[in-house]
Amino acid sequence: TVLDLDALSKAEGRKWVFHGADCLPPAYNRCLISLSDGGKDADVVREFDIAARAFVKDGFALPEGKQTATWRDADTLYVTREWAPGEVTASGYAYVTRALKRGQSLDQAVEIFRGDKADVSAGRGVLRDIDGRYVMDTSYRGLDFFNTEQAFYPNGQKVVLPFPTTAAFSAYYKGQAVYQLKSDWASARGTVFHNGAVIAFDLKAALADPAHVEPTVLFMPN
C-alpha cells in the first residue's frame, strides 16, 4: 500500500476520500495528492513522496477548497482556487491562478492568470511533451459548456490560435499539436476542414504566425 487512507483517516479524525494525484514528470516520484473529507467537492492538496510512501515534511500543502493545482516545476505550483471570498464563477468554479513557490504561504503567491467571472471555469496550466519536458504555459477559459478559449504562452506572451472555440485541443507530441474540430473551419488559404476532422500542425510555427496555420489532416469524416 502506497497510501493507507483508512489509517490516515483514523489518525486525523477525518474520512478521507481520494480525489486524484498529479505527479511531477519525468521521475513521477513527487505527487500532489487531493483528498476530500467525506467526499465533498472541496479538497486539500498535499505533496507526497512515492519512494518514501509518506507526505513530504514542510512540503506543499493547500487548505481545503474547490481548487486545482499543477506542477510548473519541482518548486512551483500553479494553483487555481477561490483566493478572495466570492472569487468564483456563476457555476461555482475558481477563475484566478497564482504561482506558489516552495516555502511560500498562500498570501505570497503571485497572480499569473485571471479569467472572467462570467466564464464557466478558467485557469492556467502547462504544456508538456511526451517525455514530461516543460514546453510552455497554457490557459483556458470555459466560455460556456460548448466553447473554450485555449491560449498558449510562447516566451510568456499570450497567443490564441484562429480555430473555432468549439475546437478541442487533444494532444501534443514532438512539436505537433493535435486538435479535433467540432464545426467547419477554413484556413487562410481557403482550405476547408469539416466538423469532426482531426488535424495536426507544428505548434511553434503556428504560434509565430497564427493567422496562417495550415494543418495536416489526420482524419476527416465522410
Please identify what each model-predicted range represents.
Residues 1-222:
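Beta-propeller folds
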